Amino acid sequence: LRMTDKLEIWTLDWVPMANGPAGFVRDLRLRWACEEAGIDYDVSTVPLAEKTSEHFSRQPFGQVPFIKDGEIEIFESGACLLHIARKNENLMPGDPVGEAETLQWTIAALNSVEMVSVPWWFLEITGAKENGLTDWLESRLSHIEGILSEREWLVSDRFTVADLLMADVLRVKKVRSFGDRPASEAYIQRVTDRPAFQNAHAAQMAHFQAADATRN
């Protein structure tokens, strides 16, 4: 299959700027990965307000992000990240052990942490009288805190795509402020201080700010 030197990343055409998800929409993960790997990318959009048949043809759940790389089309941010990471050793170690450890921690960020933190966050913001996921989230975050208190990075003593994804999961505002976890906080700060994150975050914010300006 043919791939290209420039990826196409798809995101939403607009999100509310006031108390909205700008800065956290998951195309940021893919922009960030491209910045880390030195891969050029273009951004295309699908409407937030009305899901189109084209959108569902590219992402069967009507979500973002998804990417097009030549003849290859991929949805789900984790799958997209692994595709990008395999293009460059800045994100994925070239040795079998490093690659395996990176894969396991990338999946752990999605399946062991985010699968708890997102429903917990949703119950928090919707004003649920009781959040039955709090103890579960506490357990997951405590395990991560213990690991990060002993190492700077998750894999191979260096930054990988696993750190990109784990930090993006942990930096969600309510999750980040839930409890006192100094090692996790230092980790989030260390990862998000990287120029690639700063560039990707600024690019996403500029995208949504420009879209918002056309509505005012």
Predicted features along the sequence, with ranges:
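GST-like domain detector, emphasizing the conserved glutathione-binding G-site
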Residues: L1-D135, S139, E145
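GST-like fold's C-terminal all-alpha helical module
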Residues: T4-D5, V97, T106-P195, A200-A203
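Residues that form or immediately flank small-molecule/cofactor binding pockets and catalytic motifs
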Residues: W14, V46-L48, R158, A202-M205
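Intrinsic structural disorder
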Residues: E50, R194, M205-F208
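Terminal-tail/helix-coil boundary detector
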Residues: A202-N216
